[in-house]
C-alpha cells in the first residue's frame, strides 16, 4: 500500500514512488537486521515491485508516446 499522500508537496516526477521505494528499503530486514546499505539491498532483490514501478515511471517521462497518456505511477 502506498505511503504517499496527496497533501504532501510534489517532489518532481515520480516523487511518490521514489519516497515509497526509499521507505520500503529502510524498513526491510536487509537494512534493519543485517545492517547493509539500501543500495546493496536493492541489488539483492528487495522491494522489486516498487523498483520496477519507479523504473517504468521514469521511463514514461522520456517516452514521447506516454507524454500524451500521462505518467505511470502516482
Swiss-Prot record:
GO annotation, cellular component aspect: mitochondrion
Gene Ontology biological process terms, A to Z: leukocyte differentiation; mitochondrial cytochrome c oxidase assembly; multicellular organism growth; spleen development; thymus development
UniProt modified residues of type Phosphoserine: 37
Organism annotation: Pongo abelii
Family: Belongs to the PET191 family.
Domain of life of the native organism: Eukaryota
Pfam families attached to this UniProt entry: Pet191_N
InterPro entries named among the record's database cross-references: Cyt_c_oxidase_assmbl_Pet191
Domain CHCH: 27-65
Signal peptide interval: none
Positions occupied by motif Cx9C motif: 47-57
Alphabetical UniProt keywords: Disulfide bond, Phosphoprotein
Disulfide-bonded cysteines: 30-57, 41-47
Role: Involved in an early step of the mitochondrial complex IV assembly process.
Keyword S-adenosyl-L-methionine: no
PROSITE patterns documented for this protein: CHCH
Residue interval(s) of motif Cx10C motif: 30-41
PANTHER family xrefs: CYTOCHROME C OXIDASE ASSEMBLY FACTOR 5
Annotated protein name in UniProt: Cytochrome c oxidase assembly factor 5
Amino acid at each position: 500500500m502506498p505511503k504517499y499522500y496527496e497533501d504532501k508537496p510534489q517532489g518532481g516526477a515520480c516523487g511518490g514512488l521514489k519516497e515509497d521505494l526509499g521507505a520500503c528499503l529502510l524498513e526491510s530486514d536487509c537494512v534493519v537486521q543485517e545492517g547493509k546499505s539500501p543500495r546493496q539491498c536493492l541489488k539483492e532483490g528487495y522491494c522489486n515491485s516498487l523498483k520496477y514501478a519507479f523504473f517504468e515511471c521514469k521511463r514514461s517521462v522520456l517516452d514521447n508516446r506516454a507524454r500524451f497518456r500521462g505518467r505511470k505511477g502516482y
